[in-house]
């Protein structure tokens, strides 16, 4: 979020993010000169959050609601700089980029890891999944790679149809040139979108964690 337009409204924070921020401020007041081990600190915050009552979490949930309202209000009046509009505001009707083989693997094994190690932080779960994938034999990776390839093939057909529908003249002209630049662009976008997918997952995991605790 450090990149891009400095005038863009700050992203909305979850109740858990407000809680972690408060913990960090408390820690700084008590130990102003101490360095913070991030993974250790995150683990302690996660454990403390799980033991909190719904009433204690209430103030952070109120802060999150107020921040969400602030973000939505500011986004209504925000005008992105030229050239950024296309990237920042994606068409909801556009075909969704397919998941990678690793992402499909994570979707299958994440619930198992969370079930076996409920105390693990989101970062530790991601690290464990990365280790598991690296230690998985090439033959065992094949089903995920085949599925990812099929989904990518479908996506390419869908996106070609979507682009042709949106720009009929462009579909007739310069197809060969467009294909070359498209491939390069998609390779770059793949990396960005995998990061987006991981961020989305982290947010989902955070919300799941909060929902589980509220129950």
Curated annotation (Swiss-Prot):
What are the entry keywords?
Acetylation, Adaptive immunity, ADP-ribosylation, Autophagy, Cell membrane, Chemotaxis, Chromosome, Cytoplasm, Disulfide bond, DNA damage, DNA recombination, DNA repair, DNA-binding, Endosome, Immunity, Inflammatory response, Innate immunity, Isopeptide bond, Membrane, Nucleus, Oxidation, Phosphoprotein, Repeat, Secreted
Q: Which family does it belong to?
A: Belongs to the HMGB family.
Q: Where is this region: Disordered?
A: 76-95, 161-215
For the site labelled Cleavage, the residues are 10-11, 67-68
- According to the UniProt record, list the residues that bear N6-acetyllysine: 3, 7-8, 12, 28-30, 43, 90, 127-128, 141, 172-173, 177, 180, 182-185
Q: Which organism is it from?
A: Bos taurus (Bovine)
ADP-ribosylserine: residues bearing it: 181
Task: Give one Pfam hit by family name.
Answer: HMG_box
Q: Which residues bind heparin?
A: 2-10
Show the ranges annotated as biased composition (Basic and acidic residues).
Answer: 83-94, 161-179
Task: Identify this protein by name.
Answer: High mobility group protein B1
Location of the region described as LPS binding (delipidated) in the Swiss-Prot/TrEMBL record: 3-15
From the Swiss-Prot or TrEMBL record, state where the protein is found: Nucleus; Chromosome; Cytoplasm; Secreted
Give the superkingdom in one word: Eukaryota
Identify the stretch(es) annotated as Binding to AGER/RAGE: 150-183
Give the sites modified to Phosphoserine: 35, 100
């Amino acid at each position: 979020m450090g990149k891009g337009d400095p005038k863009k409204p700050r992203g909305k924070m979850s109740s858990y993010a407000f809680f972690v921020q408060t913990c960090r401020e408390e820690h700084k007041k008590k130990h102003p000169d101490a360095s913070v081990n991030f993974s250790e600190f995150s683990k302690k915050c996660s454990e403390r959050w799980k033991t909190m009552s719904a009433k204690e979490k209430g103030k952070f949930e109120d802060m999150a609601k107020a921040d969400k309202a602030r973000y939505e209000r500011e986004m209504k009046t925000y005008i992105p700089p030229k050239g950024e509009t296309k990237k920042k505001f994606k068409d909801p009707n556009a075909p969704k980029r397919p998941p990678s083989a690793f992402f499909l693997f994570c979707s299958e094994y994440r619930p198992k890891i969370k079930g076996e190690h409920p105390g693990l932080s989101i970062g530790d779960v991601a690290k464990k999944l990365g280790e598991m994938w690296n230690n998985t034999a090439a033959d065992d990776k094949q089903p995920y790679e085949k599925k990812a390839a099929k989904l990518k093939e479908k996506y390419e057909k869908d996106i070609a149809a979507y682009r042709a529908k949106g720009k009929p003249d462009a579909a007739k002209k310069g197809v060969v040139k467009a294909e070359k630049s498209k491939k390069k662009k998609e390779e770059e976008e793949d990396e960005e979108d995998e990061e987006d997918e991981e961020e989305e997952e982290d947010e989902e995991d955070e919300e799941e964690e909060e929902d589980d605790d509220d129950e």
